[in-house]
């Protein structure tokens, strides 16, 4: 079995790529993987480690063809807030605005319901979603890239992640290994201090336009509770700024106002949102959708993004898209 480097010492990008290549290829014992992941997490992963690990994951994924302007909206998870599925709802709303969305996601690793769990509860056939991803992306402007299907090397890692029950570098790697090789991303991470580090990892890997976001309370999406850290990665540069709900013309609300439950609960909430229900969940989706629309070049500012997203919901476009998507995969 391959010996992993000491996680207490920072790794260069090539070292990290080699270590995770060994892990993903099954050349490392489970106990050693668990110790390595915990060691990295306790020390704090750096940009070169995140980028190197993502490169190893990319090299082993099953890719799909996608439009050059396709976008992904996802969070790293592991924030412990167990909110409703904001990025999943945002993906539907943004796609309904005409932006191709290659939604990359998985079942829950440390929460009650991940994107895959909730979409399945809504009636989406996950197996068919994986088999027809290119087709549905071309025909409907949205697809779900089920990580379990596109990253077969991750199969033996999931039990380790489940057993650890905590955030690891795999939360950080996932969004950077989208099988559609998207060049535009909205990525939420659970630790505000990590925003510039994660942005540097994205810069190393290459992007056309991406936002890395984190709510001050450690939410892996733009939060309505107050301030948010935002790093914009574009034209080979990183720019940092603060963003609040007021910037988008939205009211503040506590994180607990969008607390989720199991997959069935979250699916009902998402469906109610798309059917026009107002409240904090809708506002959270509008806030994050506005960010995605700015990245996609469909909105010039936060207010315009919120207006476009609200229109996609209120005209029933996002709900109709979900229905068409479910029907197409039956």
UniProtKB/Swiss-Prot annotation:
<dbReference type="GO" id="GO:0004048">
    <property type="term" value="F:anthranilate phosphoribosyltransferase activity"/>
</dbReference>
<feature type="binding site">
    <location>
        <position position="221"/>
    </location>
    <ligand>
        <name>Mg(2+) 1</name>
    </ligand>
</feature>
<protein>
    <recommendedName>
        <fullName>Anthranilate phosphoribosyltransferase</fullName>
        <ecNumber>2.4.2.18</ecNumber>
    </recommendedName>
</protein>
<feature type="binding site">
    <location>
        <begin position="78"/>
        <end position="79"/>
    </location>
    <ligand>
        <name>5-phospho-alpha-D-ribose 1-diphosphate</name>
    </ligand>
</feature>
<feature type="binding site">
    <location>
        <position position="221"/>
    </location>
    <ligand>
        <name>Mg(2+) 2</name>
    </ligand>
</feature>
<comment type="function">
    <text>Catalyzes the transfer of the phosphoribosyl group of 5-phosphorylribose-1-pyrophosphate (PRPP) to anthranilate to yield N-(5'-phosphoribosyl)-anthranilate (PRA).</text>
</comment>
<keyword id="KW-0057">Aromatic amino acid biosynthesis</keyword>
<dbReference type="InterPro" id="IPR005940">
    <property type="entry name" value="Anthranilate_Pribosyl_Tfrase"/>
</dbReference>
<dbReference type="InterPro" id="IPR000312">
    <property type="entry name" value="Glycosyl_Trfase_fam3"/>
</dbReference>
<feature type="binding site">
    <location>
        <begin position="103"/>
        <end position="111"/>
    </location>
    <ligand>
        <name>5-phospho-alpha-D-ribose 1-diphosphate</name>
    </ligand>
</feature>
<keyword id="KW-0028">Amino-acid biosynthesis</keyword>
<dbReference type="GO" id="GO:0000162">
    <property type="term" value="P:L-tryptophan biosynthetic process"/>
</dbReference>
<dbReference type="InterPro" id="IPR035902">
    <property type="entry name" value="Nuc_phospho_transferase"/>
</dbReference>
<feature type="binding site">
    <location>
        <position position="87"/>
    </location>
    <ligand>
        <name>Mg(2+) 1</name>
    </ligand>
</feature>
<feature type="binding site">
    <location>
        <position position="75"/>
    </location>
    <ligand>
        <name>anthranilate 1</name>
    </ligand>
</feature>
<dbReference type="Pfam" id="PF00591">
    <property type="entry name" value="Glycos_transf_3"/>
</dbReference>
<dbReference type="GO" id="GO:0005829">
    <property type="term" value="C:cytosol"/>
</dbReference>
<feature type="binding site">
    <location>
        <begin position="85"/>
        <end position="88"/>
    </location>
    <ligand>
        <name>5-phospho-alpha-D-ribose 1-diphosphate</name>
    </ligand>
</feature>
<keyword id="KW-0822">Tryptophan biosynthesis</keyword>
<keyword id="KW-0479">Metal-binding</keyword>
<feature type="binding site">
    <location>
        <position position="161"/>
    </location>
    <ligand>
        <name>anthranilate 2</name>
    </ligand>
</feature>
<comment type="pathway">
    <text>Amino-acid biosynthesis; L-tryptophan biosynthesis; L-tryptophan from chorismate: step 2/5.</text>
</comment>
<comment type="subunit">
    <text>Homodimer.</text>
</comment>
<feature type="binding site">
    <location>
        <position position="75"/>
    </location>
    <ligand>
        <name>5-phospho-alpha-D-ribose 1-diphosphate</name>
    </ligand>
</feature>
<keyword id="KW-0808">Transferase</keyword>
<feature type="binding site">
    <location>
        <position position="83"/>
    </location>
    <ligand>
        <name>5-phospho-alpha-D-ribose 1-diphosphate</name>
    </ligand>
</feature>
<feature type="binding site">
    <location>
        <position position="115"/>
    </location>
    <ligand>
        <name>5-phospho-alpha-D-ribose 1-diphosphate</name>
    </ligand>
</feature>
<dbReference type="InterPro" id="IPR036320">
    <property type="entry name" value="Glycosyl_Trfase_fam3_N_dom_sf"/>
</dbReference>
<dbReference type="Pfam" id="PF02885">
    <property type="entry name" value="Glycos_trans_3N"/>
</dbReference>
<feature type="binding site">
    <location>
        <position position="106"/>
    </location>
    <ligand>
        <name>anthranilate 1</name>
    </ligand>
</feature>
<feature type="binding site">
    <location>
        <position position="220"/>
    </location>
    <ligand>
        <name>Mg(2+) 2</name>
    </ligand>
</feature>
<keyword id="KW-0460">Magnesium</keyword>
<dbReference type="GO" id="GO:0000287">
    <property type="term" value="F:magnesium ion binding"/>
</dbReference>
<comment type="similarity">
    <text>Belongs to the anthranilate phosphoribosyltransferase family.</text>
</comment>
<keyword id="KW-0328">Glycosyltransferase</keyword>
<dbReference type="InterPro" id="IPR017459">
    <property type="entry name" value="Glycosyl_Trfase_fam3_N_dom"/>
</dbReference>
């Amino acid at each position: 079995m391959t010996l992993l480097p000491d996680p207490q010492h920072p790794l260069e990008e090539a070292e990290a790529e080699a270590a995770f290549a060994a892990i993903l290829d099954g050349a490392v014992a489970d106990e050693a993987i668990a110790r390595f992941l915990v060691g990295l997490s306790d020390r704090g992963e750096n940009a070169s480690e995140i980028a190197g690990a993502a490169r190893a994951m990319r090299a082993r994924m099953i890719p799909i063809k996608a439009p050059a302007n396709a976008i992904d909206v996802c969070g790293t998870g592991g924030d412990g807030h167990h909110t409703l599925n904001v990025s999943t709802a945002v993906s539907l709303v943004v796609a309904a605005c005409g932006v191709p969305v290659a939604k990359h996601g998985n079942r829950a690793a440390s929460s009650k319901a991940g994107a895959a769990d909730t979409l399945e509860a809504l009636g989406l056939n996950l197996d068919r979603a994986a088999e027809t991803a290119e087709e549905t992306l071309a025909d409907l402007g949205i697809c779900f890239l089920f990580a379990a299907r596109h990253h077969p090397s991750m199969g033996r890692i999931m039990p380790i992640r489940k057993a650890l029950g905590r955030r690891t570098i795999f939360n950080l790697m996932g969004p950077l290994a989208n099988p559609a090789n998207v060049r535009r991303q909205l990525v939420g991470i659970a630790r505000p201090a990590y925003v510039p580090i994660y942005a540097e990892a994205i810069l190393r890997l290459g992007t056309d336009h991406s936002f890395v976001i984190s709510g001050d309370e450690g939410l892996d999406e733009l939060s309505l509770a107050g301030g948010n850290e935002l790093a914009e990665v574009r034209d080979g540069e990183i720019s940092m700024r603060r963003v609040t709900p007021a910037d988008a013309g939205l009211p503040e609300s506590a994180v607990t106002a969008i607390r989720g439950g199991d997959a069935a609960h979250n699916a009902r909430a998402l469906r109610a949102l798309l059917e026009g229900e107002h409240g904090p969940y809708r506002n959270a989706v509008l806030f994050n959708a506005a960010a995605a629309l700015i990245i996609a070049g469909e909105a010039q500012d936060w207010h315009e993004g919120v207006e476009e997203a609200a229109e996609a919901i209120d005209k029933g476009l996002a709900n109709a898209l979900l229905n068409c998507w479910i029907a197409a995969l039956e």
